[in-house]
Amino acid sequence: MVCLKLPGGSCMAALTVTLTVLSSPLALAGDTQPRFLEQAKCECHFLNGTERVWNLIRYIYNQEEYARYNSDLGEYQAVTELGRPDAEYWNSQKDLLERRRAEVDTYCRYNYGVVESFTVQRRVQPKVTVYPSKTQPLQHHNLLVCSVNGFYPGSIEVRWFRNGQEEKAGVVSTGLIQNGDWTFQTLVMLETVPRSGEVYTCQVEHPSMMSPLTVQWSARSESAQSKMLSGVGGFVLGLLFLGTGLFIYFRNQKGHSGLQPTGLLS
């Protein structure tokens, strides 16, 4: 959680003021007048839930941090000489220090409980696909791509296997990419020379799943692919003939049932 505030002030109030200033006509990109930006960033750090919590408040002037408050130390520290007078003054304000020390509970732990259900506990299972980067004959250098998309949180482990043996050499990754909707994606690629009969497996482990998710890609020769396509084509053609035959049969049956038997006329 990050917010803006000044010593003794409210995070929300300071954030509102900052947004108002930045959205005013004076903050337009075409304005060439010199601007000076004062920031205060509140950071709540958590370890094992709320078992270990510390609060860090950083004071920044024109992108340079000059002072900070660390709840582990319970006092303000000067980062540069510019911040020394401020740190000394704030440390002399006992009521301010007491409020800062209490914020570990009143601000950090409290807000953890508010957002935990849709942040810390949020789980979205990844979607995994495997494909070669280029369509070319076997026994040529290729790049197998394992696309892992739409998962949350960002902690994930992706491994490549060839015929059941893990491949570590030739594995490259794009790293985590944010999708902008609180999910992530990554591409993990394996440089290899596929040979007929080999089976490549991308294995994904993620907190949203109880067990690893595996997706396989099999290397097939051109003749094997041709046979498979021929088989599929023959199967589809057979279905067409079967459908046509059934259609003709049922149409003929309907025609016969519509004929009135002879000898029943009066």
UniProtKB/Swiss-Prot annotation:
Effect of mutating residue 164 to S: In allele DRB4*01:01 and allele DRB4*01:06
Residues covered by the Ig-like C1-type domain: 126-216
Keyword set includes Transit peptide: no
Function of the molecule: Binds peptides derived from antigens that access the endocytic route of antigen presenting cells (APC) and presents them on the cell surface for recognition by the CD4 T-cells. The peptide binding cleft accommodates peptides of 10-30 residues. The peptides presented by MHC class II molecules are generated mostly by degradation of proteins that access the endocytic route, where they are processed by lysosomal proteases and other hydrolases.
Subunit structure comment from the entry: Heterodimer of an alpha and a beta subunit; also referred as MHC class II molecule. In the endoplasmic reticulum (ER) it forms a heterononamer; 3 MHC class II molecules bind to a CD74 homotrimer (also known as invariant chain or HLA class II histocompatibility antigen gamma chain). In the endosomal/lysosomal system; CD74 undergoes sequential degradation by various proteases; leaving a small fragment termed CLIP on each MHC class II molecule. MHC class II molecule interacts with HLA_DM, and HLA_DO in B-cells, in order to release CLIP and facilitate the binding of antigenic peptides.
First and last residue of the signal peptide: 1-29
Extracellular side: 30-227
Keywords: Adaptive immunity, Cell membrane, Disulfide bond, Endoplasmic reticulum, Endosome, Glycoprotein, Golgi apparatus, Immunity, Isopeptide bond, Lysosome, Membrane, MHC II, Signal, Transmembrane, Transmembrane helix, Ubl conjugation
Annotated InterPro entries: Ig-like_dom, Ig-like_dom_sf, Ig-like_fold, Ig/MHC_CS, Ig_C1-set, MHC/Immunoglobulin, MHC_I/II-like_Ag-recog, MHC_II_a/b_N
GO molecular function list: MHC class II protein complex binding; peptide antigen binding
Major localisation: membrane
Name this polypeptide is given: HLA class II histocompatibility antigen, DR beta 4 chain
Result of changing residue 254 to R: Almost no change in down-regulation of MHC class II. No ubiquitination and complete loss of down-regulation of MHC class II
Modification comment: Ubiquitinated by MARCH1 and MARCH8 at Lys-254 leading to sorting into the endosome system and down-regulation of MHC class II. When associated with ubiquitination of the alpha subunit of HLA-DR: HLA-DRA 'Lys-244', the down-regulation of MHC class II may be highly effective.
Gene coding for it: HLA-DRB4
Topological region Cytoplasmic: 251-266
Region annotation Beta-2: where it falls in the sequence: 125-227
Annotated TM spans: 228-250
Result when mutating residue 264 to A: Almost no change in down-regulation of MHC class II
Stated family: Belongs to the MHC class II family.
Record region (Beta-1): 30-124
GO cellular component, one term: ER to Golgi transport vesicle membrane
Cystine connections: 44-108, 146-202
Record flagged with keyword Lipid metabolism: no
Topology in membrane: Single-pass type I membrane protein
